[in-house]
């Protein structure tokens, strides 16, 4: 289905990184893009740059999200907002569990619950869930993050069953290491994390993820691209080992 058959899009976690890149790409495609994130200043800068409609809303604010979805019939929804905390379940606190489950899984369930029935009724729509290779593979630490992303992986497959017989498509994007500041947010030191995980590595850019999503959305109506694993060429599939070459 070409982009011209869709009119509106919702992107969560839209103020930076992959979310901002997705907003930029969708705006270039002529969509009315609603960008949702907590940081009003960054959203306003994004709106000036792209023409998107900013919404300074916490993805976990169910009342605010509900009002927005009641006002706009979204044709495309990209569930991109996510958080991670370092450490395994052995040293996790109550907040570590609650925050990651609420943002990474519960908020996605609610947004899909609020938007997918309209897509089914219109016989048109596309849900894109940003998951992770952590949904499928195991590596050290981040136990709760793994569990929440595994939930998104299962949900993405189940939504295809729920929409059986309707032209509502579902795509799960499973990135590996991407050149964003997520590692800095997890470890609490963006500069140190960039030196450890980003600088000197050949990594996909946020725009590469946005291009992959655009490819899935622009596919013919009879084609549902269900899952994409997007890793650096030099990252070992299924792990965090990424080779640095001169």
Each model region followed by its residue ranges:
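C-terminal helical subdomain
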Residues: 172-173, 192-239
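Residue(s) in the substrate-gating loop at a strand-loop-helix junction
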Residues: 132
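Active-site helix of classical SDR
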Residues: 112, 148
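Substrate-binding pocket helix/loop in short-chain dehydrogenase/reductase
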Residues: 88-89, 96-101
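Active-site loop immediately N-terminal to the catalytic Tyr-X3-Lys motif
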Residues: 90, 139-143
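Conserved glycine-rich cofactor-binding loop
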Residues: 15-16
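Alpha-helical segment proximal to the catalytic Tyr-Lys
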Residues: 117, 161-164
């Amino acid at each position: 289905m070409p982009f011209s058959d869709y009119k509106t899009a919702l992107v969560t976690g839209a103020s930076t990184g992959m979310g901002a890149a997705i907003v930029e790409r969708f705006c270039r495609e002529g969509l009315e893009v609603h960008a949702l994130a907590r940081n009003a200043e960054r959203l306003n800068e994004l709106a000036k740059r792209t023409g998107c409609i900013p919404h300074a809303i916490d993805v976990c604010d169910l009342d605010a999200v509900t009002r927005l979805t009641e006002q706009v019939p979204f044709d495309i929804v990209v569930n991109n907002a996510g958080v991670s905390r370092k450490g395994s379940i052995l040293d996790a606190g109550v907040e570590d569990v609650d925050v990651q489950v609420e943002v990474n899984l519960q908020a996605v369930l609610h947004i899909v619950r609020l938007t997918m029935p309209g897509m089914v009724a219109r016989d048109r729509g596309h849900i894109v869930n940003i998951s992770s290779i952590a949904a499928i593979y195991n590596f050290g630490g981040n136990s709760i993050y793994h569990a929440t992303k595994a939930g998104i992986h299962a949900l993405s497959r189940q939504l295809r069953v729920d929409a059986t017989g309707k032209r509502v498509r579902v795509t799960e994007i499973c990135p590996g290491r991407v050149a964003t500041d997520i590692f800095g947010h997890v470890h609490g030191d963006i500069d140190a994390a960039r030196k450890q995980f980003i600088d000197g590595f050949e990594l996909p850019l946020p725009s590469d993820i946005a291009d992959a999503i655009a490819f899935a959305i622009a596919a013919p109506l009879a084609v549902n691209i269900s899952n994409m694993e997007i890793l650096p060429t030099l990252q070992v599939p299924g792990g965090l080992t990424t080779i640095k070459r001169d």
